[in-house]
């Protein structure tokens, strides 16, 4: 991380989330890296922060998605920390944060997608749709950003105003094709930039 993302303009705060690869190892070490790297800003497994610029406010809620899926919780040999997490506590926290959020824009970010075109196990997304998506829809979240699939997908689902974004990969990009609700998809590696004013959230 430090060697790859070494450009001077990248010497800014980074706000990570835990993913499936972190859950294969020592997840606490990922949090502890906050005390070693000035850029690495991860105060907890899930956390939130509000930003303001030129009168526009954004709240970002970073969440821990691996414990939301039975696949990880039921495989303690491979993902030893997943079953130890209090899932209901996190879901209640997300609901509480979104209930009190008053910012112009609300973005939730986690590792795993709620909707995506992928060859990965369908149960992952079904668990996310069952446990997380109803909370996001209830609070009319503007955007859910994730990774995991190693390509870019922008999805809008019927009955929801949420923009579901699968962010592209920094490496190991995978092929992708449209699925239900696809607005745009692309297999190229890269990064996304989000900007906002009072009227528009732009990706």
Identify what each model region corresponds to:
Residues 146:
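Short beta-strand and adjacent tight-turn residues that come in two discontinuous sequence segments
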Residues 1-106, 120-127, 131-143, 151-197, ...:
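Extended active-site neighborhood of metal-dependent phosphoesterases/phosphodiesterases
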Residues 112-115, 149, 171:
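C-terminal structured domain segments across diverse proteins
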């Amino acid at each position: 991380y430090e060697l790859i993302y070494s450009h001077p303009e990248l010497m800014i705060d980074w706000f990570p989330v835990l993913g499936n690869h972190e859950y294969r190892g020592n997840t606490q070490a990922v949090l502890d890296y906050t005390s070693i790297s000035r850029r690495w800003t991860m105060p907890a497994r899930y956390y939130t922060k509000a930003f303001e610029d030129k009168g526009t406010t954004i709240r970002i809620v970073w969440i821990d998605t691996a414990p939301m899926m039975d696949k990880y919780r039921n495989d303690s040999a491979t993902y030893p920390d997943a079953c130890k997490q209090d899932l209901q506590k996190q879901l209640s926290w997300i609901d509480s944060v979104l209930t009190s959020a008053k910012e112009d824009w609300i973005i939730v970010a986690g590792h795993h997608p709620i909707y995506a075109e992928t060859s990965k196990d369908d149960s992952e997304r079904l668990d996310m749709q069952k446990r997380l998506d109803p909370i996001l829809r209830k609070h009319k979240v503007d955007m859910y950003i994730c990774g995991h699939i190693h390509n870019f997908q922008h999805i809008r689902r019927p009955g929801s105003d949420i923009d579901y974004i699968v962010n592209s990969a920094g490496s190991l990009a995978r092929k992708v094709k449209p699925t239900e609700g696809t607005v745009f998809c692309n297999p190229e590696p890269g990064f996304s930039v989000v900007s906002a004013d009072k009227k528009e959230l732009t990706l």
